[in-house]
């Protein structure tokens, strides 16, 4: 009995990544053995994602307010370089997608458009939506997971409490610590949640439906892999002047894997916060940069918008010159930063990019439908890239600031 409890204790306290790997293998095995049984355990995945999504808004709000309220005077938060990295990384992703799409042009088999979807009419509408999310009712922002509004109100409350008594600030610090403990508990349940998610995904879709779009997926995933394994490490190396791969691989392993299966940047915020804490990053920095990254750091979305738009142009025989491709990179990068402000995310911003080439809205919506077909893989890979990059760039900016402080 003692040996059994000792084994269970070791299992519970062991490597989370190994446990997640076991969950993935078990999920695939169950789905291969019995589709019905796999569908029965789908609720485990839904519960896990639901728990992360439920705690993420209050975690961000309290952590941001507490960090700013308890911030010492003249403390550097390094937010400017992080925002610059986010924007540059998103543009680099769009540019990489353009180059890869031109090297490997793809034809789409267009299907019927998605019913009941309403894409934005222009970049102005996307920015307008984002601005109004900024001044959303704070209670509504917490209820709906509007992280732009949550950040704005969290920063506002933190600044207002900056001159409050020490006991008031301590209450916020204690509540913040308590919520972080709850997050740690939820993250320990990741292997069970991912087991349910993998089993359900394989049972419901398999990969037969996506086989017809193999070349399109190869271009999409190839662009994302280049960003994750070549471009991002290069950017990090320029910032920290040392081998970037230990940091990049750790972030992909501990943040990217979870994000891949939850397919939600919002649900992955608590995971990223916990990883930043493990990396011993500045709490005043990551408490703001991680939720901000979940909103504007959208390299994966920029790739999706660019690749599908250029595939549509190639299918219709539209010639794309270098200047137009460059303009598409800029539009895709700006649109991607606003993806969180659009219901349906990156896919519903495709008609906006298609309008650059005079592609009609009807055809553009058929391209969106193709996006939904490959969404099982596209959305998962996009989220993994977006979410892991948030931690990578935050860590790079923090380390660069520390190195600068040591030198001078």
UniProtKB/Swiss-Prot annotation:
UniProt cross-references to Gene3D superfamilies, sorted A to Z: Sodium:dicarboxylate symporter
What are the coiled-coil residue ranges? none
- A Pfam cross-reference name: SDF
Keyword field contains Transport = yes
Where would you find this protein in the cell? Cell inner membrane
Biological process terms from the Gene Ontology for this record are: serine transport; threonine transport
Q: Where are the transmembrane segments?
A: 11-31, 43-63, 82-102, 141-161, 192-212, 216-236, 290-310, 316-336, 363-383
Reaction(s) catalyzed by this protein? L-serine(in) + Na(+)(in) = L-serine(out) + Na(+)(out); L-threonine(in) + Na(+)(in) = L-threonine(out) + Na(+)(out)
What GO molecular function annotations does the UniProt record carry, in alphabetical order?
A: neutral L-amino acid:sodium symporter activity
Membrane topology, record value:
Multi-pass membrane protein
User: Where mainly located?
Assistant: membrane
The Gene Ontology CC terms held by the record are: plasma membrane
Q: Which domain of life is it from?
A: Bacteria
Q: What UniProt keywords are attached to this protein's entry?
A: Amino-acid transport, Cell inner membrane, Cell membrane, Membrane, Symport, Transmembrane, Transmembrane helix, Transport
Report the family membership: Belongs to the dicarboxylate/amino acid:cation symporter (DAACS) (TC 2.A.23) family.
> In UniProt terms, what function does this protein have?
Involved in the import of serine and threonine into the cell, with the concomitant import of sodium (symport system).
Q: Which NCBIfam families does this entry report, sorted A to Z?
A: PRK13628.1
Q: Which HAMAP family match?
A: Ser_Thr_transp_SstT
The molecule here is called Serine/threonine transporter SstT
- Species this protein is from: Shewanella sp. (strain MR-4)
Q: Which gene encodes it?
A: sstT
């Amino acid at each position: 009995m003692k040996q059994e409890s000792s084994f269970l204790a070791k299992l519970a306290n062991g490597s989370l990544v190994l446990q997640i790997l076991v969950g993935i293998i078990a999920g695939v095995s169950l789905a291969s053995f019995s589709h019905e049984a796999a569908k029965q355990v789908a609720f485990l995945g839904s519960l896990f994602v639901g728990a992360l999504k439920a705690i993420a808004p209050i975690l961000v709000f309290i952590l941001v307010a507490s960090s700013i309220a308890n911030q010492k005077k003249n403390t550097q938060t390094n937010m400017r370089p992080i925002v610059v990295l986010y924007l540059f990384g998103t543009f680099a992703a769009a540019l990489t997608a353009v180059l890869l799409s031109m090297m490997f042009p793809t034809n789409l088999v267009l299907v019927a458009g998605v019913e009941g979807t309403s894409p934005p009419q222009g970049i102005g509408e996307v920015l307008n939506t984002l601005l109004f999310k900024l001044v959303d009712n704070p209670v509504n922002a917490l209820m709906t997971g509007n992280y732009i509004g949550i950040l704005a109100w969290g920063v506002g409350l933190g600044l207002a409490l900056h001159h409050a008594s020490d006991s008031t600030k301590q209450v916020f610090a204690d509540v913040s610590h308590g919520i972080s403990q709850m997050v740690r508990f939820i993250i320990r349940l990741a292997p069970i949640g991912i087991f349910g998610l993998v089993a359900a995904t394989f049972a419901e879709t398999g990969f037969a439906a996506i086989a017809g779009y193999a070349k399109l997926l190869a271009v999409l995933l190839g662009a994302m892999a280049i960003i994750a394994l070549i471009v991002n490490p290069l950017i990090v190396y320029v910032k920290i002047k040392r081998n970037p791969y230990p940091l990049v691989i750790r972030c992909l392993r501990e943040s990217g894997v979870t994000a891949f299966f939850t397919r939600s940047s919002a649900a992955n915020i608590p995971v990223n916060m916990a990883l930043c804490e493990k990396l011993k990053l500045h709490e005043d920095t990551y408490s703001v940069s991680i939720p901000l990254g979940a909103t504007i750091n959208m390299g994966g979305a920029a790739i999706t918008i660019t690749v599908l738009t250029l595939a549509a142009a190639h299918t219709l025989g539209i010639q794309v010159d270098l200047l137009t491709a460059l303009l598409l990179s800029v539009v895709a990068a700006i649109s991607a930063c606003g993806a969180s402000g659009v219901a349906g995310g990156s896919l519903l911003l495709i008609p906006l990019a298609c309008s650059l080439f005079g592609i009609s809205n009807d055809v553009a919506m058929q391209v969106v439908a193709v996006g939904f077909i490959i969404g099982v893989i596209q959305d998962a890979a996009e989220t993994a890239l977006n979410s892991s990059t948030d931690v990578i760039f935050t860590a790079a900016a923090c380390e660069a600031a520390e190195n600068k402080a040591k030198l001078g």
